[in-house]
């Protein structure tokens, strides 16, 4: 077993703080509209330029094992905030550093770390309560554009793009970010239910110019069976022919004489039809087919339900305004399902979303939810160079997360003002002893740090700016981009309440851990064994 290094008391805490400071000092130069960028070296390919706190923090590993522990703890603050709220990672890191430094002064002076921790927790609870009171709901497209622009480093173009996408797909819709081949960033909207399966035969095309099959007002047969014998679908084909409407078959596969029959009938003009493979795999396929059935008001014909294909009647088929398919994907537009059934299905998927721990499952459930609720928007990111493309894509993803957070819990004044306005509320925190009061004071002293830093990064004296803002009321604050004092809501300088809340909670959690740490145990680095030189050749 490898030998361990042990460090105790003050020595341990000092090493932790050194590591924490290295990460925080690298990250904090990016805060605010006048924050700088950091260039990250990559082993392969071009370096990455970013001003995203969590991306920078993740790249830092230190040689000293004790210092590295401190660095890893700050990374945890940034990652956790990023996971929960999608933004605010730099603010969280800066707050953690401020809380630790303030707390350390008192712990060294003899305060009991456990009581100090309790005081910090009580103060944070009060601040979170106050933030909820300050927050106002996101009501307009303009609000969304402001939140997204601030998160994307004051890029109004990105802000407007995300606001447009949100407006089109609604708050349950999915917005995906992809890389574009061109240099412009565009927004594409996918209407209705789209899945990645195309037509099974090119003979089914109705629009040769666009290589698409477009069927108006079709009947839709939805099954997870493989159809190869024509006798299985002959009864339903005859019934659909009598209505004069086209037929779409979504099945595990359609092959052999069944497919040949559909093609021949199409070519002869007897029945316009389209056969498509079912999307997904395994249980997910069944769930997606069930979604399609509910969306179109049809019945999912499965082996488990015991309905034979021969016995399918017209009322078991789904209906839609239009189905469009090319060789890669199929889109069902204007499904004619019962609204209540669709809403119940959406509620069911939302419940599953809350209960799942898997990131992959969450993503897939989110996609299914969007397809039922209103569609998918795709933002195609364009840029002149690979490095710029990566950086821009990253900013858009950040802005998207921040926007979703804003829709959930509302917005608060940005630029560090919201935290500053909660300081007065700390007067009401009830404490049991002097050390708990010290914990509350530590939080009080740390709440103006983000605002000071934003001003410092803009080349101003942070302490003076913070004092001026403290003298003002409500949403009044400092606009660092234009060097003026404004109403933050009116100027569009806003943060999602969820981002500010998560940043403080995660920072306080890690700070409390550092302050109550008395010992560190780390692996002793192994010395590299020197290999003897090869024997000389004779």
Swiss-Prot record:
The protein's annotated catalytic reaction(s) are: ATP + H2O + a folded polypeptide = ADP + phosphate + an unfolded polypeptide
Q: What does this protein do?
A: Together with its co-chaperonin GroES, plays an essential role in assisting protein folding. The GroEL-GroES system forms a nano-cage that allows encapsulation of the non-native substrate proteins and provides a physical environment optimized to promote and accelerate protein folding.
EC number(s) per UniProt? 5.6.1.7
Alphabetized GO MF terms: ATP binding; ATP-dependent protein folding chaperone; isomerase activity; unfolded protein binding
Keywords of this entry: ATP-binding, Chaperone, Cytoplasm, Isomerase, Nucleotide-binding
Assembly and oligomerization: Forms a cylinder of 14 subunits composed of two heptameric rings stacked back-to-back. Interacts with the co-chaperonin GroES.
PANTHER family this protein is in? 60 KDA HEAT SHOCK PROTEIN, MITOCHONDRIAL
> Which Pfam families would you find in this protein's record?
Cpn60_TCP1 (PF00118)
Swiss-Prot/TrEMBL GO biological process terms: protein refolding
State where ATP binds: 30-33, 87-91, 415, 479-481, 495
Family the UniProt entry places it in: Belongs to the chaperonin (HSP60) family.
Instruction: Give the residue range of the signal peptide.
Output: none
> Can you name this protein?
Chaperonin GroEL
Its Gene Ontology cellular component terms are: cytoplasm
Localization = Cytoplasm
Task: Report the source organism.
Answer: Dictyoglomus thermophilum (strain ATCC 35947 / DSM 3960 / H-6-12)
């Amino acid at each position: 077993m490898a030998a361990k290094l042990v460090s105790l008391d003050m020595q341990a805490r000092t090493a932790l703080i050194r590591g924490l400071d290295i990460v925080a000092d690298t990250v904090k130069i990016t805060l605010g509209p006048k924050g700088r960028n950091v260039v990250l070296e990559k082993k392969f390919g071009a370096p990455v330029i970013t001003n995203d706190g969590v991306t920078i923090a993740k790249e830092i590993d230190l040689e000293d094992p004790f210092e590295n522990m401190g660095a890893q703890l700050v990374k945890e603050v940034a990652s956790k905030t990023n996971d929960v709220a999608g933004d605010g990672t730099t603010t969280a890191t800066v707050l953690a550093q401020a809380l630790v430094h303030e707390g350390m002064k008192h712990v060294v002076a003899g305060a009991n770390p456990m009581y100090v921790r309790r005081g910090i927790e009580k103060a944070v609870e009060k601040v979170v309560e106050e933030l909820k009171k300050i927050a106002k709901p996101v009501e307009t497209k303009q609000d969304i554009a402001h939140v997204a622009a601030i998160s994307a480093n004051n890029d109004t173009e990105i802000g407007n793009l995300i606001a447009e996408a949100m407006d089109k797909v609604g708050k349950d819709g999915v917005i995906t970010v992809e890389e574009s081949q061109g240099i412009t960033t565009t927004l594409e909207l996918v209407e209705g239910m789209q899945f990645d399966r195309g037509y099974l035969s090119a003979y089914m095309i109705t629009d040769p110019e666009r290589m698409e099959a477009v069927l108006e007002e079709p009947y839709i047969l939805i099954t997870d069976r493989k159809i190869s014998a024509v006798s299985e679908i002959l009864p339903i084909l005859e019934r659909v022919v009598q209505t004069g409407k086209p037929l779409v078959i979504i099945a595990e596969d359609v092959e052999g004489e069944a497919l040949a029959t559909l093609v021949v009938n199409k070519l002869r003009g007897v029945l316009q039809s389209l056969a498509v493979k079912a999307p997904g795999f395994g249980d997910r396929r069944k769930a997606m087919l069930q979604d399609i059935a509910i969306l179109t008001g049809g019945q999912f014909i499965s082996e488990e339900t015991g309905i034979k294909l021969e016995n399918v009647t017209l009322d078991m088929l789904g209906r839609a305004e239009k189905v469009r398919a090319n060789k890669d994907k199929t889109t069902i537009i204007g499904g004619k399902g019962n609204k209540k059934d669709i809403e119940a299905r959406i509620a069911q998927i939302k419940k599953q979303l809350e209960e799942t721990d898997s990131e992959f499952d969450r993503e897939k459930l989110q996609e299914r939810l969007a397809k039922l609720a209103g569609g998918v928007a795709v933002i195609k990111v364009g840029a002149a160079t690979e490095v710029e493309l990566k950086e821009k894509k990253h900013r858009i993803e950040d802005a998207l997360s921040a926007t979703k957070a804003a829709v959930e819990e509302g917005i608060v004044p940005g630029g560090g003002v919201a935290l500053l306005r909660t300081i007065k509320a700390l007067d009401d925190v009830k404490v049991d002893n002097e050390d708990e009061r010290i914990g509350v004071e530590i939080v009080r002293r740390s709440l103006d740090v983000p605002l000071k830093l934003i001003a410092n990064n803009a080349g101003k004296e942070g302490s003076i700016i913070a004092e001026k803002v403290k003298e003002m009321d409500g949403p009044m604050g400092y606009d660092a981009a234009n060097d003026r004092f404004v109403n933050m809501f009116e100027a569009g300088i806003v943060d999602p309440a969820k981002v500010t809340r998560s940043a403080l909670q995660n920072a306080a959690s890690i700070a409390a851990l550092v302050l109550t740490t008395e010992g560190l145990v780390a692996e002793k680095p192994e010395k590299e064994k020197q290999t003897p030189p090869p024997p000389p050749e004779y």
